[in-house]
Amino acid sequence: MTSFSWPRGPPPPGPRCLGWTVPGCFPCGQSFVERNRPKTAVLAGGGFISLEMAENLAEMGVEVTILQRIPQLMNPLDYDMATFLHSHLRRKGMHLRLNTAVAGFRQEGETISALVEGGEAIPADLAILAIGVTPENALAKQAGLALGSRGGIVVNQRMETSVPDIYAVGDAVEIPHLVTGENTLISLAGPANKQGRVAADNICGGDSRYLGAQGSSVVKVCELTVAATGLNEKAAQAAGLSYEKIVLSPLSHAGYYPGGKLMTMKVLYEKGSQRLLGAQIVGHEGVDKRIDVLATAMQAGLPVTALKDLDLAYAPPYASAKDPVNLVGFMAENLEQGVVKQFHWEDVAGLPRDGSVTLLDARTPGEYSGGCAEGFVNVPLDELRDHLGEIAPGKPVYVMCQSGLRSYLACRILAQDGYDCYNFSGGYRFYESVLLDRWTRQNAYPCGVERP
């Protein structure tokens, strides 16, 4: 049985009408676009399908509005990582309506309006629903197959169902998550194809086993690549795991070779065991390569510190001598050995500004003048040793720079002089992305609404 997952339909009110489609009947939507040439489109949902559709519609000159019930797009990402995606789409001219739940749809002549909670109606020539999928289990129910808590078909490692001689694979089966061990639904083509091979082997008398998946995924959104594997922070917290996180912004290849592009990486590992729990990467080049290495290391059971020793291919056009994956291992080892302590963007607002701690920004004056975190005083790294006598002893020192490297070096200088210091994870670039996204959400107005 190779049941699929079915796109969720619209909430009422919302009769099936000409102006909207779900990705499950994409040929209908494609012919609608070709026939009617819509000028505006509203997309409900913020996952893979919605974003890929949004990109293609925008390329055709359609004005796109994306509605998402939660504060971010791309649920496999944490909010802080998703902010880079939000900024990219806004720069492409798309309208993001986050924290906006669709309550229904209303047909008005040739226009369809998305009705959002709170009463607002958003008119468009085309509406596309991509608000998630549910397992297609109707046949499984008729056949008396056992279903799991998520509505998927229960199978063992041989892909056998609860009924002898019936095998099931694909989107509608519940499989073990390789990180948590809990059964889950992973609607991706990679796992489905591997399950099919296992089932076929066993049907033909073999003894193959499918152990599970960790949800490795990648998607192209305009010029940006977004990838994830394993757990994000939300999932790790829900699983009750104690974890540490590492954020870095390396170049896709050696900095002295032209054309390198920044990527932002976030890696989670379990405290104590150092077990890799998950990774997220957003960038332009080399994203898929790094997520695949991290996914392989996770499935192989490597501890996070083992990443520093991976012998990865290097040439200036493709990588750095210390690959971004190696850097994750170096940074984790520094944390585990107590070489450095860190703080995160969500900690910044709670830092006292009463003089009981010292807040330093180790960037250049030019970088600092372009924006800084409140209360952080500019002492460039190259001048830090000249100003050590001006930094109050006995007070914790929190240090920030653009990416996290110079602030780390500043922390090493300070620690060697007896200071208790903390390095900002991800750098000001990461912090600024989160703050800009929050500011935009608080100050943005729907199209056609005048600012007061």
Question: Which positions does each model-derived feature cover?
Answer:
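Short hydrophobic core segments
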Residues: 1-9, 44, 122-132, 196, ...
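Glycine-rich dinucleotide-binding loop and its adjacent helix/turn
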Residues: 8-62, 95, 149, 155-157, ...
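Residue-level detector of alpha-helix initiation sites
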Residues: 10-12, 32, 48, 80, ...
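FAD-site-proximal beta/loop scaffold in flavoenzymes
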Residues: 23-38, 120-201, 293, 297
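Rossmann-like dinucleotide-binding cores of NAD(P)H-dependent redox enzymes
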Residues: 48-106, 187-192, 209-235, 434, ...
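A Rossmann-like FAD-binding core segment of flavoenzymes
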Residues: 60-157, 447-452
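Mid-to-C-terminal Rossmann-like scaffold of FAD/NAD(P)H-dependent oxidoreductases
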Residues: 172-285, 316-320, 324-350, 357
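Rhodanese-like catalytic fold shared by cysteine-dependent sulfurtransferases
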Residues: 305-316, 320-357, 365-396, 402-452
